[in-house]
Structures are given as structure tokens and as C-alpha cells.
């Protein structure tokens, strides 16, 4: 199910890029000369920053999975990009909420209504060090700490 959603979003992005590139080709001159994108522009486009990304509504609002939404995904700004060092990754420093009007369709498909849904967008991004431990490893460590804090009764020495 998730793979199908991702594939659908991928196709939508691909279609958008195809339309954009066709317009760019027809707007340019008919010469066979290729334009070279300068390094500074390449770096600026690929460096850690908020970028638009299609996100599934059901992933952002998991308590609403019993309904169908149209559109099923929305365009949100998310931190993405390269940091120039393998020890760093792109993370959000500041977020902001955005409210969008979405068509909400119940399972029986009637009556559907327009609803306002709030989503979180990344506004400011920064390259930060990657933490070595994963969330699962931190949970295991926390569980062990809790166990060791519980008082243990000792048997009296006779």
C-alpha cells in the first residue's frame, strides 16, 4: 500500500518535471548547444535547505486513515539536500504550520465535505552531526535504565 502511494507521488512529480522540461526546451533556441550549469548554482540547489516534497495526508494524519482524501498527497517544504560531509545530515531548525482545504470522503462515500487540515512545514534547515544510536537502540537503553533503577530486595545473610 505504501509502495503504491510512493509510486503514485513519484509519477506525479515525474509528470510535473516532464511538462516543465518540455516548456524549457520549446522556449530555448533550436541550437544543439548545451548550457552548462555553473558550480555555485549546482551547489546552491543541492545544499541542505527546505525543498518542496509531496507528502501523503494519511502519513501526516494517521488517525484519519478511515477516510479518503482528495488530493491524497500535498506539497510541503521539507529539509533535504547534501551537507558536504558524511558525518552530517540535513535537519529542520524551524517549522511552521500551514492549513489547506482538502476534500474528505468517508468510507461510505457520502456525504463528502471540504475540511481544513493543518500540516507542519520545515522553514529553516541546517547540517547537524549524525547521532550514532538509532531510535530503537535508545529505547532499549532507556528500558535497561528503568529496570536498574527499581530497588532490588536482598536476601539477609544468615
UniProtKB/Swiss-Prot annotation:
<comment type="similarity">
    <text>Belongs to the PDGF/VEGF growth factor family.</text>
</comment>
<dbReference type="GO" id="GO:0051781">
    <property type="term" value="P:positive regulation of cell division"/>
</dbReference>
<keyword id="KW-0217">Developmental protein</keyword>
<feature type="glycosylation site" description="N-linked (GlcNAc...) asparagine">
    <location>
        <position position="29"/>
    </location>
</feature>
<feature type="region of interest" description="Disordered">
    <location>
        <begin position="136"/>
        <end position="158"/>
    </location>
</feature>
<dbReference type="GO" id="GO:0032870">
    <property type="term" value="P:cellular response to hormone stimulus"/>
</dbReference>
<dbReference type="GO" id="GO:0042802">
    <property type="term" value="F:identical protein binding"/>
</dbReference>
<dbReference type="GO" id="GO:0002040">
    <property type="term" value="P:sprouting angiogenesis"/>
</dbReference>
<keyword id="KW-0339">Growth factor</keyword>
<feature type="glycosylation site" description="N-linked (GlcNAc...) asparagine">
    <location>
        <position position="30"/>
    </location>
</feature>
<feature type="signal peptide" description="Or 26">
    <location>
        <begin position="1"/>
        <end position="23"/>
    </location>
</feature>
<dbReference type="GO" id="GO:0048010">
    <property type="term" value="P:vascular endothelial growth factor receptor signaling pathway"/>
</dbReference>
<dbReference type="GO" id="GO:0005172">
    <property type="term" value="F:vascular endothelial growth factor receptor binding"/>
</dbReference>
<dbReference type="GO" id="GO:0007565">
    <property type="term" value="P:female pregnancy"/>
</dbReference>
<keyword id="KW-0221">Differentiation</keyword>
<feature type="disulfide bond">
    <location>
        <begin position="79"/>
        <end position="125"/>
    </location>
</feature>
<dbReference type="GO" id="GO:0010467">
    <property type="term" value="P:gene expression"/>
</dbReference>
<dbReference type="GO" id="GO:0038084">
    <property type="term" value="P:vascular endothelial growth factor signaling pathway"/>
</dbReference>
<dbReference type="GO" id="GO:0060754">
    <property type="term" value="P:positive regulation of mast cell chemotaxis"/>
</dbReference>
<feature type="compositionally biased region" description="Basic residues">
    <location>
        <begin position="137"/>
        <end position="148"/>
    </location>
</feature>
<dbReference type="GO" id="GO:0008083">
    <property type="term" value="F:growth factor activity"/>
</dbReference>
<feature type="disulfide bond">
    <location>
        <begin position="83"/>
        <end position="127"/>
    </location>
</feature>
<keyword id="KW-1015">Disulfide bond</keyword>
<protein>
    <recommendedName>
        <fullName>Placenta growth factor</fullName>
    </recommendedName>
</protein>
<dbReference type="GO" id="GO:0001658">
    <property type="term" value="P:branching involved in ureteric bud morphogenesis"/>
</dbReference>
<dbReference type="GO" id="GO:0060688">
    <property type="term" value="P:regulation of morphogenesis of a branching structure"/>
</dbReference>
<dbReference type="InterPro" id="IPR029034">
    <property type="entry name" value="Cystine-knot_cytokine"/>
</dbReference>
<dbReference type="GO" id="GO:0042056">
    <property type="term" value="F:chemoattractant activity"/>
</dbReference>
<keyword id="KW-0732">Signal</keyword>
<feature type="glycosylation site" description="N-linked (GlcNAc...) asparagine">
    <location>
        <position position="97"/>
    </location>
</feature>
<feature type="disulfide bond">
    <location>
        <begin position="48"/>
        <end position="90"/>
    </location>
</feature>
<keyword id="KW-0037">Angiogenesis</keyword>
<dbReference type="GO" id="GO:0001938">
    <property type="term" value="P:positive regulation of endothelial cell proliferation"/>
</dbReference>
<dbReference type="GO" id="GO:0044877">
    <property type="term" value="F:protein-containing complex binding"/>
</dbReference>
<comment type="function">
    <text>Growth factor active in angiogenesis and endothelial cell growth, stimulating their proliferation and migration. It binds to the receptor FLT1/VEGFR-1. Also promotes cell tumor growth.</text>
</comment>
<dbReference type="InterPro" id="IPR050507">
    <property type="entry name" value="PDGF/VEGF_growth_factor"/>
</dbReference>
<dbReference type="GO" id="GO:0001666">
    <property type="term" value="P:response to hypoxia"/>
</dbReference>
<dbReference type="GO" id="GO:0005615">
    <property type="term" value="C:extracellular space"/>
</dbReference>
<dbReference type="GO" id="GO:0008284">
    <property type="term" value="P:positive regulation of cell population proliferation"/>
</dbReference>
<dbReference type="GO" id="GO:0009410">
    <property type="term" value="P:response to xenobiotic stimulus"/>
</dbReference>
<dbReference type="GO" id="GO:0005977">
    <property type="term" value="P:glycogen metabolic process"/>
</dbReference>
<dbReference type="GO" id="GO:0001890">
    <property type="term" value="P:placenta development"/>
</dbReference>
